[in-house]
């Protein structure tokens, strides 16, 4: 997972509240076994409408999604995060996230930044009045900047640390690789053990 400290990209104002994971990526796409290639599935039902914001330039090149409250509700789907990332989003701003979506995002390297709704409204106005305006999200200072709007955002310390260090679950485990190897070396031979992957 890549480290995340600061990102600047085109902001996409999504004036929708209660966006659930089935709207983010419909269930029909969950049959795939890979973790990539989901960009076409993102908001698939809504993108059938030519007027949908992600079908419009310059928003189709956006990397900062500015959504309404209660983003990512519904069932737990890592695919929702994968679809957002595959489309090109690095961060989602909302005044409230579903806990499961927030957790999945942090584990996959997508920043879910909780911004006060009043500030979201101000950012929406900037982005709608000047399409293509870039939004800077600074994880170090926990600040969002868009036009003349400067707003703080909330994120729990543990997820912030993981993003800054670029640590997914595997990365966290590998921090203890020496201890794991030492433990495995002392285990009786008759017990099961994990073998190294074979590259072919």
Curated annotation (Swiss-Prot):
Its EC number is 4.2.1.33. One of its GO terms (cellular component) is 3-isopropylmalate dehydratase complex. SUPFAM superfamilies: LeuD/IlvD-like. GO terms for molecular function: 3-isopropylmalate dehydratase activity. It catalyses: (2R,3S)-3-isopropylmalate = (2S)-2-isopropylmalate. The keyword Amino-acid biosynthesis applies. The keyword Thylakoid does not apply. Keywords: Amino-acid biosynthesis, Branched-chain amino acid biosynthesis, Leucine biosynthesis, Lyase. It is an enzyme of class 4 (lyase). It comes from the Bacteria. One of its GO terms (biological process) is L-leucine biosynthetic process. Pathway: Amino-acid biosynthesis; L-leucine biosynthesis; L-leucine from 3-methyl-2-oxobutanoate: step 2/4. Pfam families: Aconitase_C (PF00694). Belongs to the LeuD family. LeuD type 1 subfamily. HAMAP family: LeuD_type1. Heterodimer of LeuC and LeuD. PANTHER family: 3-ISOPROPYLMALATE DEHYDRATASE SMALL SUBUNIT, 3-ISOPROPYLMALATE DEHYDRATASE SMALL SUBUNIT 2-RELATED-RELATED. Catalyzes the isomerization between 2-isopropylmalate and 3-isopropylmalate, via the formation of 2-isopropylmaleate. This is 3-isopropylmalate dehydratase small subunit. The gene is leuD.
């Amino acid at each position: 997972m890549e480290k995340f400290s600061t990102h600047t990209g085109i902001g996409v104002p999504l004036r929708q509240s209660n966006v659930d994971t089935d709207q983010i990526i419909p269930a029909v796409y969950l049959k795939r076994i890979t973790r990539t290639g989901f960009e076409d599935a993102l908001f698939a039902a809504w993108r059938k409408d030519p007027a949908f914001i992600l079908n419009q330039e310059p928003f189709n090149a956006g990397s900062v999604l500015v959504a309404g409250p209660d983003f990512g509700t519904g069932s737990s789907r890592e695919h929702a995060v994968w679809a957002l990332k595959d489309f090109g989003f690095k961060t989602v701003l909302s005044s409230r996230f579903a806990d499961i979506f927030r957790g999945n995002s942090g584990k996959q390297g997508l920043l879910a930044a909780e911004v006060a709704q009043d500030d979201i409204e101000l950012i929406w106005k900037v982005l709608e009045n000047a399409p293509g305006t870039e939004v800077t999200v600074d994880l170090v200072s926990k600040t969002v900047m868009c036009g003349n709007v400067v707003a703080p955002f909330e994120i729990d310390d543990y997820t912030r640390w993981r993003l800054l260090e670029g640590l997914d679950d595997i990365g966290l485990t590998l921090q203890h690789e020496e201890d794991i190897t030492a433990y495995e070396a002392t285990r009786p031979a008759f017990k099961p053990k994990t073998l190294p992957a074979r590259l072919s």
